[in-house]
Amino acid sequence: MTSKSSPLIFERSREGRYAYSLPKSDIKTNSVESLLDDKFIRKNKAEFPEVAELDLVRHYTELSNKNFGVDNGFYPLGSCTMKYNPKINEKVARIPGFSESHPLQDEDQVQGSLEIIYSLQEELKEITGMDEVTLQPAAGAHGEWTALMIFKAYHENNGEGHRDEVIVPDSAHGTNPASASFAGFKSVTVKSNERGEVNIDDLKRVVNENTAAIMLTNPNTLGIFEKNIMEIREIVHNAGGLLYYDGANLNAIMDKVRPGDMGFDAVHLNLHKTFTGPHGGGGPGSGPVGVVKELASYLPKPMVIKDGDKFKYDNDIKNSIGRVKPFYGNFGIYLRAYTYIRTMGATGLKEVSEAAVLNANYIKARLSKHFEIPYKQYCKHEFVLSGVRQKEFGVRTLDMAKRLLDFGVHPPTIYFPLNVEEGMMIEPTETESKETLDYFIDTLISIAEEAKNDPDKVLEAPHTTVIDRLDEATAARKPILKFENLKQEK
């Protein structure tokens, strides 16, 4: 690996330099020693970087210019819905009445904020076909876990605590079995059929008296709609299990079909995907959970309800699993999502899904002559191609993904789902123009030609990025996580 990266802020530090200074305080202060127990007081001076203001500004401006995001390039990261985030969302989120409020304020002082929470709950109920919605979970996987804990409490409350198995398709998100494990369940895999859908015969084989639930994404991670969903519902419900909907792919079906109408008992949504909350960099996210009326009494508390012409917190939820997030979740994301939903309206959301599906099928059709497409039918919002043809020339999907970086395109998701060899999962979203799609398609076709005629160019990519090929094995086995370790390495 070679690096053209900037120095760390700590490496720019010079003793005695400072960015700004404050006047001496005329307020009486107390020493740290008088306020804290000895065990909380540092023995050595904290090693904060000492830099001038100009150096500080240049450092972070330089780093920001090296970042890649939806605002400066195409980001077809499959199963992540990297759509453009409208800037009006940011303006609304910065309205002082919202941005300067505090979750510990009295209800009477934050009626506007509570109304936003309540109204967003109502909008999401309509979109999903669920009877009740909580906004508390902070991310998709957190929403998965919350729903599974509701399922667990429901089964235990009905004298069926022995139900400890959750069925997960072999094409599922990795978070599904992980969330099941965190919730105390065992994961049982159900295989896909030749069309990429749940194998009904295999489902009948694995379902039993210990089945607590099945976790499904529809359309699934291959971008294929599970057309047998009503039969799946009947099989699982007849066995006493529940149906969980992973909302990662809701962008494909808004105002077309609702999870509740398909027979799902609970659903989580990703406000940071489908509803344009910004994501990447670790957060913040938001993973609301909706449930049918039979599960409503198990939702986390508090809920926000409307009482006459006022809004208030409701802690009187009989079988509640308790809080799953301090206060009431990531409120700033609610504002962005609510703004998006109200801006688009039902017709606009329907057009979003139509455009997302059209874009994915356009790319798939144009690439089908140059790459292996394991599932030939029309896809929904995303699809998976395979790099097995290019592998014949010694070039793998990883190499092609690295080469895309040289063309200013973020690589799609690779090697996922696991049941596609040399897989590359592409999700263009609805916000990209035909010109952008054509550029991406032409770029991938040119890389496929390079793989055949000049494989070394692909194998040595990327050529233009700040960081070249990472030594991923060493990075995983011997990570440098602290600055002092970096100094030792040097």
UniProtKB/Swiss-Prot annotation:
Query: Enzyme group, top EC level?
Result: oxidoreductase
Q: What is its EC number?
A: 1.4.4.2
InterPro entries, per the entry = Aminotrans_V_dom, GcvPB, GDC-P_C, GDC_P, PyrdxlP-dep_Trfase, PyrdxlP-dep_Trfase_major, PyrdxlP-dep_Trfase_small
Q: Which cofactor does it need?
A: pyridoxal 5'-phosphate
Keywords, ordered alphabetically = Oxidoreductase, Pyridoxal phosphate
Name the job this protein performs. The glycine cleavage system catalyzes the degradation of glycine. The P protein binds the alpha-amino group of glycine through its pyridoxal phosphate cofactor; CO(2) is released and the remaining methylamine moiety is then transferred to the lipoamide cofactor of the H protein.
Query: Quaternary arrangement and interactors, per the entry?
Result: The glycine cleavage system is composed of four proteins: P, T, L and H. In this organism, the P 'protein' is a heterodimer of two subunits.
Q: What is this protein called?
A: Probable glycine dehydrogenase (decarboxylating) subunit 2
